[in-house]
């Protein structure tokens, strides 16, 4: 039986932001969301977030999580003081408590599982996650005997010169037997440089305290400023991209590519340089994305290509060709084997299979049938200044260059729309629609001569 407490009360002054530190984003999730995700495989009985600075904003960010409780630390007087706030709500709890930092989002679930298993196997009062750092500056040092039993923990700011030579550091991740921890918490003092209550002091009041080393010391990295946030993003991205390449995905110039860990890539996908895949995006088998493309919360079918284009909240069918420089957004549905060409924007529209929108067009709130050919410069005028209106174009229709459809309007199947037409009435199937002024020619026309210099 395990409960989880996440320390999320700090302001994060070094972030230089009005946003609480734990709400800064890393790969599509806030830092604190990533911490909560890491402990999900443990199936904790309770998850408690200890909040303080902008508590309402932090709670609001997790409003959809009914499994998360909140406890407020009104004054931020240290990690020990934060855990003391749990005494009332856990007074009858008899299990283990896992303590995590809300600004340490790189922990792997496997690391926490190993920490908990070691703690329970040895019947420890406390088990600490430790790491051997090349540069331990800023971290508390952990001193152990030969059996990994902890004898002392000293915060970095309180270390003397000899203690600073120890590179085994406290990762700030703990597993406690709660009843024994609860008995020790009232004994904490603020007898240190910061006048804070350190959770590490409980080691002095507990027996059987053990340290467990993390395999990859980068997992314990905390985030205190923008530089560390950028470094964490690099670490996360390298993990994600290494995993995908191991599964048979081709990444050309991986350093220029970013992929959220919510993205799904099917076999034989190729990702070209300077491409970014975000949110709940799925890329189908054999598709080629990029270079220079952004796809967010969208589904791309098999054997499709997206070149120098932006796709958001939309669906792209099998065999489609997008780009260069197309923009598909707002729940658009591009069905199989369509071509969406250069400088084309499609918004909240359905484009039927085998249709072509090759260049310089805007289709908004439109529904196109199959095999529609949209001429260059075709526009759906869908907004009347108050409301959006639909344009319906039937299968097999061809629109001439520089056509405008003033919605709401319906065009039947097999229609030909003459170039330069402004269509503001419904057009029956199988017809030719011409809606433009007649061409006028004036014979023997000469451009008037330009005025000479000095004349008005």
From Swiss-Prot:
Residue sites binding acetyl-CoA per the record: 376, 382-383, 419, 436
Region (N-acetyltransferase): 248-456
List of residues binding UDP-N-acetyl-alpha-D-glucosamine: 7-10, 21, 73, 78-79, 140, 155, 170, 224, 329, 347, 362, 373
One GO cellular component term noted in the UniProt record for this chain: carboxysome
CC cofactor note: Binds 1 Mg(2+) ion per subunit.
Swiss-Prot/TrEMBL catalytic activity: alpha-D-glucosamine 1-phosphate + acetyl-CoA = N-acetyl-alpha-D-glucosamine 1-phosphate + CoA + H(+); N-acetyl-alpha-D-glucosamine 1-phosphate + UTP + H(+) = UDP-N-acetyl-alpha-D-glucosamine + diphosphate
GO biological processes: cell morphogenesis; cell wall organization; lipid A biosynthetic process; peptidoglycan biosynthetic process; regulation of cell shape; UDP-N-acetylglucosamine biosynthetic process
Pathway it works in: Nucleotide-sugar biosynthesis; UDP-N-acetyl-alpha-D-glucosamine biosynthesis; N-acetyl-alpha-D-glucosamine 1-phosphate from alpha-D-glucosamine 6-phosphate (route II): step 2/2; Nucleotide-sugar biosynthesis; UDP-N-acetyl-alpha-D-glucosamine biosynthesis; UDP-N-acetyl-alpha-D-glucosamine from N-acetyl-alpha-D-glucosamine 1-phosphate: step 1/1; Bacterial outer membrane biogenesis; LPS lipid A biosynthesis
Entry binding sites for Mg(2+): 103, 224
Key words of the record: Acyltransferase, Cell shape, Cell wall biogenesis/degradation, Cytoplasm, Magnesium, Metal-binding, Multifunctional enzyme, Nucleotidyltransferase, Peptidoglycan synthesis, Repeat, Transferase
Ranges where the record places region Pyrophosphorylase: 1-226
One Pfam family per UniProt: NTP_transf_3
Positions of the UniProt region annotated as Linker: 227-247
Enzyme Commission number(s) from the entry: 2.7.7.23, 2.3.1.157
Gene Ontology MF terms in the entry: glucosamine-1-phosphate N-acetyltransferase activity; magnesium ion binding; structural constituent of carboxysome shell; UDP-N-acetylglucosamine diphosphorylase activity
Similarity comment text for this entry: In the N-terminal section; belongs to the N-acetylglucosamine-1-phosphate uridyltransferase family.
Subunit (UniProt): Homotrimer.
Functional description taken from the UniProt entry: Catalyzes the last two sequential reactions in the de novo biosynthetic pathway for UDP-N-acetylglucosamine (UDP-GlcNAc). The C-terminal domain catalyzes the transfer of acetyl group from acetyl coenzyme A to glucosamine-1-phosphate (GlcN-1-P) to produce N-acetylglucosamine-1-phosphate (GlcNAc-1-P), which is converted into UDP-GlcNAc by the transfer of uridine 5-monophosphate (from uridine 5-triphosphate), a reaction catalyzed by the N-terminal domain.
Protein's name according to its UniProt entry: Bifunctional protein GlmU
């Amino acid at each position: 039986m395990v409960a989880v407490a996440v320390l999320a009360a700090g302001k994060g002054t070094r972030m230089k932001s009005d946003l609480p530190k734990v709400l800064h984003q890393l790969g599509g999730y806030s830092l604190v969301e990533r911490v909560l995700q890491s402990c999900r495989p443990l199936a904790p009985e309770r998850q408690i977030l200890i909040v303080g600075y902008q508590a309402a904003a932090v709670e609001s960010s997790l409003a959809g999580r009914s499994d998360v409780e909140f406890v407020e630390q009104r004054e931020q007087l240290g990690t020990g003081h934060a855990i003391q706030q749990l005494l009332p709500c856990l007074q009858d709890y008899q299990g283990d408590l896992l303590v995590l930092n809300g600004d340490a989002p790189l922990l792997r679930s496997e690391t926490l599982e190993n920490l908990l298993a070691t703690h329970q196997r040895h019947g420890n009062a406390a088990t600490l996650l430790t790491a051997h750092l090349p540069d331990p500056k800023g971290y508390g040092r952990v001193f152990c005997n030969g059996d990994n039993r902890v004898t002392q923990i000293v915060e970095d700011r309180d270390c003397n010169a000899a203690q600073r030579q120890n590179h085994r550091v406290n990762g700030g991740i703990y597993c406690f037997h709660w009843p024994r921890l609860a008995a020790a918490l009232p004994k904490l003092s603020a007898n240190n440089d910061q006048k804070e209550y350190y959770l590490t002091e409980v080691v002095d009041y507990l027996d059987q305290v053990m340290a467990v080393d993390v395999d990859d010391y980068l997992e314990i990295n905390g985030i205190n400023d923008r530089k560390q946030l950028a470094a964490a993003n690099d670490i996360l991205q390298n993990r994600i991209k290494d995993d995908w390449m191991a599964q048979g995905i081709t990444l050309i110039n991986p350093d220029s590519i970013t992929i959220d860990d919510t993205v799904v890539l099917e076999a034989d996908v190729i990702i070209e340089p300077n491409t970014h895949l975000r949110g709940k995006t799925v890329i189908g088998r054999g598709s080629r994305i990029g270079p220079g493309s952004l796809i967010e919360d969208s589904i791309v079918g098999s054997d499709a290509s997206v070149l120098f284009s932006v796709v958001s909240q939309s669906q792209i069918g099998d065999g489609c060709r997008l780009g260069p420089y197309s923009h598909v957004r707002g729940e658009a549905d591009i069905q199989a084997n369509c071509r969406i060409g250069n400088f084309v924007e499609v918004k909240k529209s359905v484009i039927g299979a085998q249709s072509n929108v090759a260049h310089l067009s805007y289709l908004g709130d439109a529904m196109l049938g199959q095999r529609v050919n949209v001429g260059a410069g075709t526009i759906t005028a869908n907004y009347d200044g108050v409301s959006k209106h639909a344009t319906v174009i039937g299968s097999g229709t061809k629109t001439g260059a520089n056509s405008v459809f003033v919605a709401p309007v319906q065009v039947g199947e097999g229609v030909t729309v003459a170039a330069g037409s402004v269509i503001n009435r419904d057009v029956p199937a199988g017809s030719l629609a011409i809606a433009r002024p007649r061409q006028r020619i004036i014979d023997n026309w000469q451009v008037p001569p330009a005025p000479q210099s000095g004349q008005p």
